[in-house]
Amino acid sequence: LKWKRTLWILWAANFSITAGTNLVIPFLPYYIEHLGVHQLEDLERWSGWVFSAQFVTSFLFQPLWGRIADKHGRKIMLLRAALGMCVVTTLMGFVTAPWQLLALRLLNGVFSGFISMAVSLQASITPTEYSGRALGLLQTGGIAGSLLGPLFGGVLAEAVGYRNVFLFTGGLFFIASLVVFFLVHEEKKTADTTSKAAKMDWATIKPILPVFVASFITNLGMMSIEPIVTVYTRTIYHGGHLELVAGLVVAITGFANLIGAPTLGRLGDRIGQRKTLLIAMSMSALAFLPQAWATGIVVLLLGRFLLGLFVGGMVPSLNVLVKKMAPPNLLATAYGFNTSSLFLGNLIGPLMGSHVAAAFGLRTVFYVTMAILLLDALFIWFNRHLGEQPEWEAD
């Protein structure tokens, strides 16, 4: 079947893009230091700016690329993202000052959007009854890349130097573009200008707002813990190999994602995406309790695993709900807004977590994030018509 073939092709491309994006993350502060920033406070400031820059421009540009994709096709937007990031990332290997790196990270965010376009393309060709498992499996490509990318990035940096890693990453993005160009086939459809779906435009996007809010809160919850999790690990673990244990605490959620995404994706196909989303969101919230109560490393690891398991199930459900509720002529636009919501969570989550930890203590972050997720679960609960046949389709 065409949708299954495309799924595996996009899985490989997603893996390449996400692995490449994460290859440079472990040594970004060291690279900035290599560019001449040596004072600790300045290094921390520049590292924060350079790391966050890509999320800012990605957040701003995703809906625009989605709108263009709805008019001109998703494949060309996949190529735009892969080739754009290929050129920009390669240029990062030649910078001589931190402001140049910052500018290129901002530009890289402008060109990003490969993952959301891949999801949009896959959603558009997959039968609705298989959407959960297909989008859940597609998500695992990105998860695998985000897990392996930092590991190989650190190894490569030691072996060939910082600058060559950027060149290698540009090569990965170029390979992804070749995969898309030669192996992904998108049918060109004649634009429907007579249906209510084609005319309503933005009015048909408004009912999907609860999904966008849930996407934002999903990443807000995950990212709020990231700035403090290694510090928190040190407060409850006093044995040897602290760095290894802290790395395991961070990575275990990703491994759980690999299990949760396809498993709960299939569950959503059986019992409905709204029910699955409610289960996953409620259980994700409760998974913060063992983390907050942990006095030993085993309980913390268990809580982190449960969190990754159920958060992994939230994203496929959210993606399927977007597919069901968005009119076909605005599907990529809707996924663009959904991706912007995820990036906004990436931006605000770490800021919220670090400020709450500084003001009220490390454990408070877990309780605050749990409360936010539970409130969002209530929000989804009261939106009882979420995922039902939309007005544009009924007409």
Regions found by a protein language model. Name each.
Residues 1-3, 185-213, 395:
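Juxtamembrane intracellular "pre-TM" segments in multi-pass secondary transporters
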Residues 27-44, 228-244:
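Short amphipathic helix-loop junctions that connect adjacent transmembrane helices
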Residues 49-65, 251-263:
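Central cavity-lining transmembrane alpha-helices of secondary-active solute carriers
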Residues 59-96, 268-274:
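Conserved MFS/SLC helix-loop-helix module at the cytosolic interface between two early adjacent transmembrane helices
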Residues 76-91, 170, 275-290, 370:
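Structural signature of the two symmetry-related core transmembrane helices
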Residues 88, 99-107, 287, 298-306:
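Paired small-residue
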Residues 104-142, 320-321:
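Cytoplasmic helix-loop-helix junction between adjacent transmembrane helices
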Residues 180-193, 381-393:
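Helix-loop junctions on the cytosolic side of multi-pass membrane transporters
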